[in-house]
């Protein structure tokens, strides 16, 4: 059985928040999660959401520059 702790090293790979949901929902649906595991999931989602938001803002600024 895969645990949340085993997923943590791969959190960089989980990436985009949509992918976060695709991976996390099966865990939430089928495995009783401890408080530690829920907090770990929240941390991974927060980390990756912030990372993608920053990339999106940079991309938007690049499109707004006069060409």
From Swiss-Prot:
GO terms for cellular component: host cell cytoplasmic vesicle membrane; membrane. Keywords: Host cytoplasmic vesicle, Host membrane, Membrane, Transmembrane, Transmembrane helix. The chain crosses the membrane at residues 22-38. It is found in: Host cytoplasmic vesicle membrane. Residues 13-18 are annotated as: Important for viral replication in intestinal cells. It is a single-pass membrane protein. Facilitates virus release from intestinal cells in vitro, possibly through the host autophagic pathway. This is ORF2p protein.
């Amino acid at each position: 059985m895969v645990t949340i702790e085993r997923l943590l090293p791969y959190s960089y790979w989980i990436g985009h928040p949509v992918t976060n949901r695709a991976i996390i929902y099966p865990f939430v649906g089928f495995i009783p999660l401890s408080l530690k595991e829920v907090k770990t999931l929240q941390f991974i989602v927060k980390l990756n959401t912030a990372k993608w938001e920053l990339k999106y803002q940079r991309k938007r600024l690049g499109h707004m520059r006069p060409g």
